From Swiss-Prot:
Keywords: DNA replication, DNA-binding, DNA-directed DNA polymerase, Nucleotidyltransferase, Transferase. It is an enzyme of class 2 (transferase). One of its GO terms (molecular function) is DNA-directed DNA polymerase activity. Transmembrane segments: none annotated. It comes from Thermococcus sp. (strain 9oN-7). Its EC number is 2.7.7.7. PROSITE patterns: DNA_POLYMERASE_B (PS00116). Belongs to the DNA polymerase type-B family. This is DNA polymerase. It catalyses: DNA(n) + a 2'-deoxyribonucleoside 5'-triphosphate = DNA(n+1) + diphosphate.
Length: 775
């Protein structure tokens, strides 16, 4: 199994290293024969000797073309002859490429920016993560001492925790009497002990949570400060910290550094990405949070260190559990894309598509288009019409079916052969013309991207059939990871067409796909309403919610299934409408904002949730009660009564203070805040009193009654004393409770002022309150 590749230099020549695990053993294979190259298109082939004379300097050495050969390629499906220019060293390529491009005989150069080790994987057809090797994993985490205003890495590391499949332990340098804590004499000894643990356990995978941007950089800084050689690589090297966009990325040679943070950001949509929030979202179990100031206080006072050690150990355990959960999917993506898991786990979906296409292009002898320069990038900036949205029908509705297209955009790309190489191509016998935008796509041959996408969808269907047939739970799970990886990739192709930095960028393709998408969903709505008596309540891009006013549940379900049998034969190619679900009741507010309840009583909301930290418990609780009243009981008036009751209790100071606490996270150094929100104001006052505040600290506060700015009236939650303080009832009504329910009840004709007990009485809203869709 290939874990990763890189190259080193021996006697001025590049040597590819392939890090592998075979038969349970780690090994490094070397290849000294692979040469760096790129392609050049010439106006006149006779100029090649002149081009070979172009030189550049790199570190005082003259760089030039080592040799050249003429090759037959295809560019966007059309035959083309180009020159393949070879060089002595990968670093020669960036040194000389602009000079060769500037030569009068050169039309353009291609594939000059593909990193050497990645090029090797592509050209040799090697697939990382392929095979059945059992990889060993170790997760680790650090706790540090931080004071406001200190430079990063100044404070000591207090604890290093680690976990694998057999144990979870903490190393520290203060006396803590717990069975899983190893106590050493100094910070230096602690770091050296941890490095020894890694060498002895020799894991194939190191798992961190934001290790790219924190743990490794902090360890490196402390190692430099304390004179420790920070060797973690299997070749004896130190971790390599490099910039990747606006973040950092850390490589450990011979081991896969699996940072969960970018993976989870790409995979799960959460209001906050603390380790605690992620763990609860994934496993449904809470994890205690010990804040930075609590760690500092415990360390400096010596009291409560057991709690900090337990927290540190749990950090490592939780990171290990999350790593085991997410690693198999990333391994499948790595196999599918054909690049290392280290790269794939840090890639956007657009980059995943691009690396997949680069590998397939090489296999099909296609020359990859160049990435855009700044001028071209500016030209590409600009939008196009998206998916169709039908504005929602207001009110409360019963017996709702949800129908949607299976893989709408991938199906359109394949069905209509939407691809840069088929776009407006002259001399074709047959074209598909996109509605509204009028772009033509040749149907005489399968386009590069549609054919690849077709293969992917076909493979996914085969895997799903295998999943149904197998009785082995492990095989079923692995197949599921594979089909999900394919789904992620396949669903990213449409977005890739419109991605301005893409090599195979094609705005005409992207806007044609959405134009066909609009045509098909509008046609489905028309047929559903006119021929089957449905009322479409809301539609968005590839799916719709609909009911038959006055019909019971069984009738609605039966008619929906009859409609699918009627409509699917009318849809071209791979397009297929599916029955996705049935809901007992629901309401639709605006675009992408609705709530429905299924037959098991499960409420699903979209765009209405308030799960961010900066909502108090009273706001969350009120919204949940309002949704339950409307969806479970079908009673909008009850929902309004709940809101009035809560606002009344707030006004009369009858709500317990624990329900009023607002939590907000400090995301940067306090001195970097321009605007001072309530949490920042509280944090600054705490810092002035000696409390340690750093990025990541969560401030919990309550807003008091009074005049002046909110920030001046916010106090730490644990300082609130009901005998001395009064909360600001008006603030909680206007900024917490009403915003949490206002957009829901607005769908039934209520205004904000209708929801307060002390304001105007309820006016005639019978038309809104009547449950629609009933007999």
């Amino acid at each position: 199994m290939i874990l990763d590749t890189d190259y080193i230099t021996e006697n001025g020549k590049p040597v590819i290293r392939v890090f592998k695990k075979e038969n349970g053993e780690f090994k490094i294979e070397y290849d000294r024969t692979f040469e760096p190259y790129f392609y050049a298109l010439l106006k006149d082939d006779s100029a090649i000797e002149d081009v070979k004379k172009v030189t550049a300097k790199r570190h005082g050495t003259v760089v030039k073309v080592k040799r050249a050969e003429k090759v037959q390629k295809k560019f966007l499906g059309r035959p083309i002859e180009v020159w393949k220019l070879y060089f002595n060293h990968p670093q020669d390529v960036p040194a000389i490429r602009d000079r060769i491009r500037a030569h009068p005989a050169v039309v353009d150069i291609y594939e000059y920016d593909i990193p050497f080790a990645k090029r090797y994987l592509i050209d040799k057809g090697l697939i990382p993560m392929e095979g059945d090797e059992e990889l060993t994993m170790l997760a680790f985490d650090i706790e540090t001492l931080y004071h406001e205003g200190e430079e990063f890495g100044t404070g000591p590391i207090l604890m290093i925790s680690y976990a694998d499949g057999s144990e979870a332990r903490v190393i520290t340098w203060k006396k803590i009497d717990l069975p899983y804590v190893d106590v050493v004499s100094t910070e230096k000894e602690m770091i050296k002990r941890f490095l020894r643990v890694v060498r002895e356990k020799d894991p194939d995978v190191l798992i961190t949570y934001n290790g790219d941007n924190f743990d490794f950089a902090y360890l490196k800084k402390r190692c430099e400060e304390l004179g420790i050689k920070f060797t973690l690589g299997r070749d004896g090297s130190e971790p390599k910290i490099q910039r990747m966009g606006d973040r950092f990325a850390v490589e450990v040679k011979g081991r896969i550094h699996f940072d969960l943070y970018p993976v989870i950001r790409r995979t799960i949509n959460l209001p906050t990405y603390t380790l605690e929030a992620v763990y609860e979202a994934v496993f449904g179990k809470p994890k205690e949070k010990v804040y930075a100031e609590e760690i500092a206080q415990a360390w400096e006072s010596g009291e409560g260190l057991e709690r900090v050690a337990r927290y540190s150990m749990e950090d490592a355990k939780v990171t290990y559990e999350l790593g085991r959960e997410f690693f198999p999917m990333e391994a499948q993506l790595s196999r599918l894309i054909g690049q290392s898991l280290w790269d794939v786990s840090r890639s956007s979906t657009g980059n995943l598509v691009e690396w997949f296409l680069l590998r397939k292009a090489y296999k099909r002898n296609e020359l990859a288009p160049n990435k855009p320069d700044e001028r071209e990038l500016a030209r590409r900036r600009g939008g196009y019409a998206g998916g169709y949205v039908k504005e929602p029908e207001r009110g409360l509705w019963d017996n709702i079916v949800y129908l949607d297209f299976r893989s709408l955009y991938p199906s359109i790309i394949i069905t209509h052969n939407v691809s840069p190489d088929t776009l407006n191509r002259e001399g074709c016998k047959e074209y598909d013309v996109a509605p509204e935008v009028g772009h033509k796509f040749c149907k005489d041959f399968p386009g590069f991207i549609p054919s690849l996408l077709g293969d992917l969808l076909e493979e996914r269907q085969k895997i799903k059939r295998k999943m149904k047939a197998t009785v082995d739970p492990l095989e079923k799970k692995l197949l599921d990871y594979r089909q999900r990886a394919i789904k992620i990739l396949a669903n990213s192709f449409y977005g890739y067409y419109g991605y301005a930095k893409a090599r195979w960028y094609c705005k005409e393709c992207a806007e044609s796909v959405t134009a066909w998408g609009r045509e098909y969903i509008e046609m489905v709505i028309r047929e559903l309403e006119e021929k089957f008596g449905f009322k479409v309540l809301y539609a968005d891009t590839d799916g719709l919610h609909a009911t038959i006013p006055g019909a019971d549940a069984e009738t609605v379900k039966k008619k929906a299934k009859e409609f699918l049998k009627y409509i699917n034969p009318k849809l071209p190619g791979l397009l297929e409408l599916e029955y996705e679900g049935f809901y007992v009741r629901g309401f639709f507010v605006t675009k992408k904002k609705y709530a429905v309840i299924d037959e098991e009583g499960k409420i699903t909301t979209r765009g209405l949730e308030i799960v961010r930290r900066d909502w108090s418990e009273i706001a969350k609780e009120t919204q949940a009660r309002v949704l339950e009243a409307i969806l479970k009981h079908g009673d909008v008036e009850e929902a309004v009564r709940i809101v009035k009751e809560v606002t009344e209790k707030l006004s009369k100071y009858e709500v317990p203070p624990e329900k009023l606490v607002i939590h907000e996270q400090i995301t940067r150094d306090l001195r970097d805040y321009k605007a001072t929100g309530p949490h920042v104001a509280v944090a600054k006052r705490l810092a002035a009193r000696g409390v340690k505040i750093r990025p990541g600290t969560v401030i919990s506060y309550i807003v008091l009654k009074g005049s002046g700015r909110i920030g001046d009236r916010a106090i730490p939650a644990d300082e609130f004393d009901p005998t001395k303080h009064r909360y600001d009832a008006e603030y909680y009504i206007e900024n917490q409770v009403l915003p949490a329910v206002e957009r829901i009840l607005k769908a039934f004709g209520y205004r904000k002022e209708d929801l307060r007990y002390q304001k105007t009485k309820q006016v005639g809203l019978g038309a809104w309150l009547k449950v629609k869709g009933k007999k």
